[in-house]
From Swiss-Prot:
Pathway: Amino-acid biosynthesis; L-leucine biosynthesis; L-leucine from 3-methyl-2-oxobutanoate: step 2/4. Transmembrane segments: none annotated. GO terms for biological process: L-leucine biosynthetic process. NCBIfam families: hacA_fam (TIGR01343), IPMI_arch (TIGR02086), PRK00402.1 (NF001614). Binds 1 [4Fe-4S] cluster per subunit. It comes from Saccharolobus solfataricus (strain ATCC 35092 / DSM 1617 / JCM 11322 / P2). GO terms for molecular function: 3-isopropylmalate dehydratase activity; 4 iron, 4 sulfur cluster binding; metal ion binding. Its EC number is 4.2.1.33. Its cofactor is [4Fe-4S] cluster. This is 3-isopropylmalate dehydratase large subunit.
Length: 416
C-alpha cells in the first residue's frame, strides 16, 4: 500500500512516472517553460552554441518582455530584437511583447495550473505556486535543456507545512505573511524544502495574497512554495480563464518535516528594513523614518488588490514623497483603470505606467539615488538592488507604502 503523499510528492511522482520520496534524484517531465528578455537571450545563446535550436513543445513555452520593457538603452533593444527573431523563426505562439507585463503575472493569469511542474529562467518563478504548481527558477543552461528535451532533473525537497488560520487583520495582506515567515525563520532556513501552505478559510486569503507569498518563496531559499489548491484556486482560474481546474491536493496523513501556524487576525503590518529581507520589524518600530520615494508594484505586489488598497488610502490626498505605481500586467492595469484606482493615484501625484520590472531591479523608471530611503512593495532590499549602493530600501505591503507616500515618512496604516 502506498504511503500518504504531500502535494510535492504527488506532483513529482506524476512528473517522474514513479513513486518518489524526499531526497530522491529524479528526472521529471516539464509542463511549462518560460523566460523573459533579460534571461531569454542567454537561453537561446546556449541552444545556438549547442547547435540545438528546437523546442520540445512550442505551446509549452511562454516568453514575456518585462525587465527591459520598454528598452532603456540600445543594448536592451538589441536583446529584444534577437529574441523576437527567435519567436518568429520558431513560431512560438505564447509571446508577450513590451506592452503586456511581467512574466510571472502572465503565468498565473493565463497558464499555471494545480499539479504542474513549471520552470523559468528567473528566481521568482515560485510565484506560480499560488495556484498549487511546483514552480522553480533555473539558470540558462538548465532551461535550454528543458526546452530541448521537455525534462529536467530535480532533488525531491523536504515538505514543510504552514497553516494560515483566521481572517487577516486590517491592512494585513500576503506581503505581511511572507515577511513574517522570513522574520521568524530567516532567509536560509528553508533550503532544500518546499513550503506547502494550507488556508483554513480559503476565501479570506485571495489569490493576489497567495501570489505575493509564493513570489517571495525564493527569498526564503525554498525550492518551491505552494498553496494547497482549494475553492479560491477554482474561483480565480475560472474568473481569469473561463474553466475550472482539476485540483491536486495532499493525502490525509501525509508527513511533513515540521508544521507552523500563523494567526492572521493577530498579525501586525511588517517591514523588512535594510539591507536584508529577513531584517523584519513591526512598522511602528520604524515610524517616522524619512521616505524619498515609494514604489507600489512589481511581480510581488502589482495586482488589483494592491492598487485597491493604495487608492483607498490615497483618495483625495496628495503624496509628499515621489511615488511610482506599476500594475504587473495589462489586465491588472486595465481593471485598475476601469475601477478608478489609476485616476486616484494620478490625482494624488503618483507616476503610473504599465507592467515593467524597471525600478525593482534598479534598471530604469525610478532608480534610487545615493542616500535615499525607498519604501517598496517589491521583493528584495540588498545594497544596490534598486539603484545606488548608498540607498536604503524598506520592503512593505501596499498599505504601508501608500500611507508612507502621503506622509513622507514610514507610517503605520492603522492610524487611518
Amino acid at each position: 500500500m502506498m504511503s500518504a503523499k504531500t502535494l510535492t510528492e504527488k506532483i513529482l511522482s506524476r512528473a517522474s512516472g514513479k513513486d518518489v520520496s524526499p531526497g530522491d534524484v529524479i528526472e521529471a517531465k516539464v509542463d511549462l517553460v518560460a523566460f523573459h528578455d533579460l534571461t531569454g537571450y542567454h537561453v537561446i545563446e546556449v541552444m545556438e552554441k549547442a547547435n540545438m535550436i528546437k523546442v520540445f513543445d512550442k505551446s509549452k513555452l511562454v516568453i514575456a518582455f518585462d525587465h527591459l520593457a520598454p528598452p532603456p538603452d540600445v543594448r536592451s533593444a538589441e536583446i529584444q530584437g534577437y529574441i523576437r527573431k527567435f519567436v518568429k523563426s520558431e513560431g512560438i505562439p505564447n509571446f508577450y511583447d513590451i506592452n503586456y507585463g511581467i512574466l510571472h503575472e502572465v503565468m498565473i493569469e493565463q497558464y499555471a495550473n494545480p499539479g504542474q511542474v513549471i520552470l523559468a529562467a528567473d528566481s521568482h518563478t515560485t510565484t506560480s505556486g499560488a495556484v498549487g504548481a511546483f514552480a522553480q527558477g533555473m539558470g540558462a543552461s538548465d532551461i535550454a535543456a528543458a526546452l530541448i528535451t521537455g525534462k529536467t532533473w530535480l532533488v525531491v525537497p523536504q515538505p514543510f507545512k504552514v497553516v494560515l488560520e483566521g481572517k487577516p487583520a486590517k491592512w494585513i495582506t500576503g506581503k505581511d505573511v511572507a515577511l513574517k515567515l522570513l522574520g521568524d525563520f530567516k532567509a536560509d532556513y528553508f533550503n532544500g524544502m518546499t513550503l506547502e501552505i494550507f488556508v483554513k478559510d480559503p476565501l479570506s486569503f485571495p489569490m493576489d495574497y497567495r501570489a505575493t507569498v509564493s513570489n517571495m518563496g525564493i527569498e526564503m531559499n525554498a525550492d518551491a512554495l505552494m498553496f494547497i489548491p482549494d475553492q479560491e484556486t477554482k474561483r480565480y482560474i475560472k474568473e481569469m480563464r473561463g474553466y475550472e481546474p482539476e485540483l491536486v491536493t495532499p493525502d490525509n496523513g501525509a508527513k511533513y518535516v515540521d508544521e507552523y501556524t500563523i494567526q492572521l487576525d493577530e498579525m501586525e503590518p511588517l517591514v523588512a528594513a535594510p539591507h536584508s529581507v529577513d531584517n523584519v520589524k513591526v512598522v511602528n518600530e520604524l515610524e517616522g523614518t524619512p521616505v524619498d520615494q515609494v514604489y507600489i508594484g512589481s511581480c510581488t505586489n502589482g495586482r488589483l488588490s494592491d492598487f485597491e488598497i493604495a487608492a483607498k488610502i490615497m483618495k483625495g490626498k496628495k503624496v509628499k514623497s515621489r511615488c511610482i505605481a506599476i500594475p504587473a500586467s495589462y489586465r491588472m492595469f486595465k481593471e485598475a483603470l476601469e475601477r478608478g484606482y489609476i485616476q486616484t493615484l494620478v490625482d494624488a501625484g503618483c507616476i503610473v505606467t504599465y507592467g515593467t520590472c524597471g525600478p525593482c531591479l534598479g534598471g530604469h523608471f525610478g532608480i534610487a539615488g545615493p542616500g535615499e530611503n525607498i519604501v517598496s512593495t517589491s521583493s528584495r532590499n540588498f545594497k544596490g538592488r534598486m539603484g545606488s549602493n548608498e540607498a536604503k530600501v524598506y520592503l512593505s505591503g501596499p498599505a504601508v507604502a501608500a500611507i508612507s507616500a502621503l506622509e513622507g515618512k514610514i507610517t503605520d496604516p492603522r492610524v487611518i
